[in-house]
Amino acid sequence: RYTTRVVDIVAPVGRGQRGLIVSPPRSGKTTLLLHIAEAIREKYDEQIHLMILLVDERPEEVTEFRRALPGAEIYASSNDEASRNHTRIAELAIERAKRLVEAGKDVFLLMDSITRLARAYNGAMSSGKGGRNRATGSGGITIGALEVPRRLFAAARNTREAGSLTILATALIQTNSRADEAIFME
């Protein structure tokens, strides 16, 4: 596919790196992630453990990933689930990735999307214990809501004694939402 070849030429991704695919809604970010996943499976299936995290995604998208990548380790929460379910599945996926790295594996985690994950943490924090008493920052984001998504994204690393964790995530911009802009800027 040309898309993955262009990405490889313009912005090559090395083991242990983290990267963002930033664009407006409905511009093909999820399709690009699917193409990248297919390319990784085709070229590095034996060397790299591929994981996919789909947060607050349409059920059709989840099904498309599962059909296109049989046997892939896919963690997904659909958009008809509660915010707490989105946050749980993300934490489960990142902890699994960390354990694989500790076991010496090279892991590539594709995440769609870090914006929706941050929204889920914001929703979970504002509706959880003491949520109504929590202070809000720019864009109506609850203080501390972006801490966990930032930590999850920062988990990417290349270790000497074990494996590596590479994370490539999507981020939304130009949504006319101050919250999404605050998430992206953070």
Task: For each feature predicted by the language model, list its residue ranges.
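P-loop NTP-binding catalytic core
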Residues: 1-21, 27
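P-loop NTPase catalytic core
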Residues: 27-29, 34-186
